[in-house]
A protein has these predicted regions:
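Histidine-acidic metal/acid-base catalytic patches
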Residues: 16-38, 42-135
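Conserved anion-binding
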Residues: 2-14, 21-22
Length: 135
């Protein structure tokens, strides 16, 4: 049995003793016992960069909430999710980096904001993008 952890934004925006909470958690957990589910959108809302985190912790992620982000149009969040490839996240590069360093990773396409489109229309667009990228 393994324990799994899904990040939010605070792990990247808050620190303890000058060290980012996410870094503390990663160095304090055994990868054989604790799997990581990286949420790219939450990471960006916390002020981090997905490519940098994936490079820093190769092989540590068993699943990824794949999101692209744009500046939020309303609410308290800095960013909101959008169609893959339409925002500021280098999503394809992040997926490719994880695929090279990790085995059996699950990619969960997640979009929580739709910019006037229906969720189903967005899912169709995201699927088309993933196919275009070769996945």
């Amino acid at each position: 049995m393994k324990f799994g952890y899904h990040n939010h934004d605070f792990e990247f925006s808050e620190s303890l003793g000058g060290e980012m909470l996410y870094d503390i958690m990663m160095k304090s957990t055994d990868p054989k016992l604790v799997i990581q589910q990286l949420d790219i959108g939450n990471l960006y809302n916390g002020g981090a960069n997905a490519a940098e985190i994936v490079k820093k912790y190769p092989g540590r992620f068993s699943s990824i909430h794949v999101k692209d982000e744009i500046k939020a149009s309303e609410g308290n969040e800095k960013y909101e999710s959008t169609i893959l490839g339409a925002g500021i996240v280098n999503t394809k590069d992040v997926i490719d980096m994880v695929r090279k360093k990790s085995k059996n990773v699950h990619y969960i396409i997640e979009q929580e904001s739709y910019q006037g489109k229906t969720p189903l229309d967005c899912a169709k667009e995201d699927l088309a993008i993933m196919k275009k990228w070769g996945y």
